[in-house]
Amino acid sequence: MDPVPDLPESQGSFQELWETVSYPPLETLSLPTVNEPTGSWVATGDMFLLDQDLSGTFDDKIFDIPIEPVPTNEVNPPPTTVPVTTDYPGSYELELRFQKSGTAKSVTSTYSETLNKLYCQLAKTSPIEVRVSKEPPKGAILRATAVYKKTEHVADVVRRCPHHQNEDSVEHRSHLIRVEGSQLAQYFEDPYTKRQSVTVPYEPPQPGSEMTTILLSYMCNSSCMGGMNRRPILTILTLETEGLVLGRRCFEVRICACPGRDRKTEEESRQKTQPKKRKVTPNTSSSKRKKSHSSGEEEDNREVFHFEVYGRERYEFLKKINDGLELLEKESKSKNKDSGMVPSSGKKLKSN
C-alpha cells in the first residue's frame, strides 16, 4: 500500500485527494436480469428504473400520519358559570323530605322547615327522601354539590379543612359531602371550576313507598379554620340524565356539635326579628276626608309604627321612654276630660 502523500492544508488538497480515488466503470457493474424476481431494470438516459408494479406491496398510506392538534393560547376552556341555587322541580316535580327529629340535644341531624336548613353533626348520616311524580329516564343520577351561600364567597370552592383531610386516607378525602350505604357513589371534580360533587344512581322507590332515600354525611364542621370557616353553605341536589338537569332542590346546611340546640336558637332569633303582623285599615285620600284638625291628630296618635332595636339595654331604655310618653298622654286626656265637664246651670264643676 502506497503511503499517503503529505498534502498541503489548503482548499485544493481535498480535490487532489478525490482525483486519486479510482472506481470501476459503470459498464462493469452487475445489474439484475429480466428473469430475476425483483423485477427488471430499464435504462432511461443516465438512470435505471425498476420496471415492476409495487402497488401490491407498497403501502401508499405510510405517509398519511395524523397530525395531533397542538394546544395554543387561542383555545379557551368552556365558560364557567355560577351554580344556580333556586329550586326547580321540573317536569318530574322533584321534592325533598327530611325526617322529623325535633330539637333535642341528643339528635345528630334535624331539619328546620322555617329556615330550610339542615343541622347535622360531623360525619353523621342524614337521611334525605327524594320523590318524583314519574319515573326518570334510565341511567338518571342524583348529584349533591356544596356551594357557599353568600355572594362574596360563591366563587370559592367548598372543601374540607386540611386537618380533617390529613386524618383521612381515602382518595376523595377533600370532598365535603359523601354518600353512605352505596357502592355506586362516584366523586367528581370539575376540571375548570374545581367544584366537587358526588353522584349516585337514581333508584325507584321500594314497593309500598313513594320516596327514595339517600344518605348524606358532611365531613367537616362549619367552624373549621382553613375550610368553611363559619361561612354558610348550601347543598344543591339535582336529578340529572346525560348532563341534563331534570330537577333541582337547594337547602342550607350547618355542621355543628349540637344540631338541636343551634336549630332552636336560630329559629327563636328569626321569630324575634320578624315584626308582628297587624291588620291595617286602608286609608282614603286626604283630599276626600273632611275631618277637623283635632280628629286628625287623634288618628295620627293611634297609628302604630315598628322598628328594630339591637341590644337588650338599648331596647329597655327606649321602652321606658315609650312607657313614660304613654303615661303623660293618659294623664293629659284625664285632665282634659275633667276640665270639660260643665253642669246644666252653666257653672264649671270643681274637680276633686
Swiss-Prot record:
Site (Interaction with DNA): K105
Motif Nuclear export signal in this chain: 316-327
CDD domains recorded: P53
Gene Ontology terms for molecular function: DNA-binding transcription factor activity, RNA polymerase II-specific; metal ion binding; molecular condensate scaffold activity; promoter-specific chromatin binding; RNA polymerase II cis-regulatory region sequence-specific DNA binding
Superkingdom classification of source: Eukaryota
Gene Ontology cellular component annotations, sorted alphabetically: cytoplasm; mitochondrion; nucleus
Annotated disulfide bonds: none
UniProt modified residues of type Phosphoserine: S351
Basic (repression of DNA-binding): annotated span: 334-350
Region feature (Interaction with DNA): 254-261
Annotated positions binding Zn(2+): C161, H164, C220, C224
Primary location: cytoplasm
Record note on cofactor: Binds 1 zinc ion per subunit.
Oligomerization: annotated span: 302-331
DNA-binding region residue numbers: 87-273
Keywords tagged on the record: Activator, Apoptosis, Cell cycle, Cytoplasm, DNA-binding, Metal-binding, Nucleus, Phosphoprotein, Transcription, Transcription regulation, Tumor suppressor, Zinc
Keyword DNA-binding: yes
Region of interest: Transcription activation (acidic): 1-48
Ranges spanned by the short sequence motif Bipartite nuclear localization signal, renumbered to the chain: 276-291
Domain notes: The N-terminal and C-terminal disordered regions undergo liquid-liquid phase separation (LLPS) following homotetramerization and activation. Post-translational modifications, such as phosphorylation or lactylation affect the ability to undergo LLPS. The nuclear export signal acts as a transcriptional repression domain. The TADI and TADII motifs (residues 17 to 25 and 48 to 56) correspond both to 9aaTAD motifs which are transactivation domains present in a large number of yeast and animal transcription factors.
Function recorded in the entry: Multifunctional transcription factor that induces cell cycle arrest, DNA repair or apoptosis upon binding to its target DNA sequence. Acts as a tumor suppressor in many tumor types; induces growth arrest or apoptosis depending on the physiological circumstances and cell type. Negatively regulates cell division by controlling expression of a set of genes required for this process. One of the activated genes is an inhibitor of cyclin-dependent kinases. Apoptosis induction seems to be mediated either by stimulation of BAX and FAS antigen expression, or by repression of Bcl-2 expression.
Subunit: Binds DNA as a homotetramer.
Family recorded in the similarity comment: Belongs to the p53 family.
Protein name: Cellular tumor antigen p53
Organism for this UniProt entry: Oryzias latipes (Japanese rice fish)
